[in-house]
A protein has these predicted regions:
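Serine-esterase "nucleophile elbow" of acetyl-processing enzymes
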Residues: 20-102
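Catalytic His-Asp segment of secreted/periplasmic serine-dependent ester chemistry enzymes
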Residues: 22, 148-227
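Surface-exposed cleft-lining segments at the edges of enzyme active sites
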Residues: 77-80, 109-121, 156-162
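Proline-aspartate-enriched helix->loop->beta-strand connector
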Residues: 99-108, 137
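Charged helix-capping and loop-helix junction motifs
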Residues: 118-128, 166-169
Length: 227
């Protein structure tokens, strides 16, 4: 699906008044890969009270079931490579249909690659969180920070100038978590270097994590008693 929709984003000024900004937003998400993953999810067995990792390719590439093979509850991977906040919002009803025990949500970087205004991403996050609360009120919700990227390694033009957008997005995600009374997990200290970039130790392409990085990720979740 390739479609563009027009948003009127209202931003409250720090001094007074409300200013309206008009932005053309790329809200597309349902490409062939998204559709194939959704078809795959639909054919999987129904599992109640699972722990779900939800997000884009950074989530999808993790072997969560193996990383948490000794965990006492089922663990499901609901990552879709290339997904963004619009795509996750569109499929959240399916994600929580079977009343998961917990949802670990991570998104954001693909929104940044499109240069979506943070207000749009946060609005989508808020709607995702509220849909989970409405459809599955006993589900524990964890918002995980967007990870930095390393523009010294990335090769695609759409990654240029994007890493500087990540800290502000994460500040707004942290504030959203407080407002919605859910848990915010800051993963950035695990994987960033002194310059705030995704450390070369943990990436090959400047965007995605190497497999062993996920061991560190899961250790943090266990240490914090989120798992």
């Amino acid at each position: 699906m390739n479609r563009y929709i027009l948003f009127f984003i209202f931003l409250t000024g720090s001094v007074g008044g409300i200013t309206a900004q008009q932005a053309k937003i790329d809200s597309s998400y349902a490409n062939w890969y998204y559709q194939q993953r959704m078809a795959y999810f639909e054919k999987l067995p129904t599992i109640q009270r699972a722990v779900i990792f939800l997000g884009n390719s950074i989530t999808e590439r993790a072997e969560w079931q193996e990383l948490l093979a000794d965990y006492r509850y089922p663990v499901l991977n609901r990552g879709i490579g290339g997904d963004n906040s619009f795509g996750i919002l569109a499929r959240i009803d399916d994600v929580v249909r079977n009343k998961p025990r917990a949802v670990f949500l991570m998104d954001g970087i693909n929104d940044q690659f499109r240069k979506l205004p943070h207000e749009v991403s946060i609005q989508n996050y808020r709607r995702i969180v509220r849909k989970i609360k409405m459809k599955s009120p006993r589900t524990k919700i964890y918002i995980q920070s967007a990870l930095p990227i390393n523009e010294m390694i990335t090769t695609e033009d759409y990654t240029r100038g994007r890493n500087e957008l990540v800290p502000e997005l994460n500040k707004k995600l942290s504030q959203l978590a407080k407002e919605e009374d859910v848990v915010f997990i800051d993963l950035c200290p695990l994987f960033q270097d002194d310059e705030g970039r995704l450390s070369k130790e943990y990436t090959v392409d400047g965007v995605h994590l190497i497999p062993t990085a996920y061991i560190k990720w899961v250790k943090l979740l266990k240490d914090k008693k989120y798992l």
